[in-house]
């Protein structure tokens, strides 16, 4: 039945996407995060929906009559510079060339999404639709899995679909955390229009928090706690927020297992935790890879190439200041970098890391700048709210990504695109209209 329903809806969706390219770019991110193929079992599972929606987006933009004026600004310039830097590092890859180019192709699709967000999204309706697509993908999956977790009394382990960008439970947990501020923005904007919608969005947010717990991801839990603290500091409703937090924590404590508690307890004893120190070993080898190739690094997935891993392991004791305790490199299997920062360092060198950090910092500060500029104008409260929430999402990614190989997550580059649109088109246009009025 799923296949029949989805395939019956597909022509309608394609028609709407062709007529309104902003719908197409929203469906692009929806398919990227929701992975509809995993929900379908018959003929519907054989279609490449993301590719189809991407093609419709591109064609839809090309035939648009009134294309928005495009300015990429500093943030866009940094992102495009980083993209060309990854091209150079891929061309000089130390790993398996075919693997490096495969991941380069994947990253090209991420950059393509960023570009078309900037090209097409032009007003509040477009942004809100895009964010609803995010919530109806990541948020829907999180809420559904959280219900299973609660019904099972905490026994259900929440994981992503195999082969999906969010297949790993740690990356899935971080995606849930990143989606929470987006949910809050939509709650603020649309919750006042309907009591049912307000209660529904509050329920979804509570379930997403439960989903983070259900993944048993330490990185996701840390990101959630740091986000909660940061959100509490920035909130104007600290007492109600604290009460809700205490109630939610009390409810969720009834479902966590002893296994979850034991796993979270290792956060405080990371230096003696074998799993964590294994990550530190991977960080050090990423650092050594960058020291050997400081400008362009080893290319995509070079660290996870067995021959490269073994060669780097020979220099493991060269940098004694990089503490790894008693942990040593695995001589049988290479490992991922387990940190967006060390991942970029190893893949694209110190220069690539500098560009990547500049992108994150510029986006974070740009969100703050947008909120401050819009704050004095009553008609732009939604801009203040959205910029603040996107800043929180960037902050959550910066914290949670410190222990995950998740540097090329498309949602983050889409968020950068939304900030760019707000800064270069929506905010200047709104301010100009208010001045002329």
Feature roles, as predicted:
Residues 1-88, 97-98, 122-132, 186-199, ...:
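Transmembrane signal-anchor hairpin modules in multi-pass inner-membrane enzymes, especially those
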Residues 1-3, 44-52, 102-106, 165-178, ...:
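Membrane-interface micro-motifs in multi-pass membrane enzymes
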Residues 8-17, 80-91, 108-113, 126-158, ...:
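Alpha-helical transmembrane segments of multi-pass inner-membrane proteins
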Residues 30-42, 339, 343-348, 381-423:
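Membrane helix-loop boundary segments at the extracytoplasmic
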Residues 40-44, 92-101, 213-214, 402-406:
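Membrane-interface helix caps and helix-loop-helix hairpins in membrane proteins
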Residues 56-60, 240, 359-363, 392-437:
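Transmembrane alpha-helices of multi-pass inner-membrane enzymes
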Residues 147-152, 209-215, 231-274, 284-292, ...:
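A membrane-periplasm/extracellular boundary helix in multi-pass inner-membrane enzymes
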Residues 158, 163, 268-284, 296-348, ...:
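Long extracytoplasmic/lumenal interhelical loops at the membrane interface
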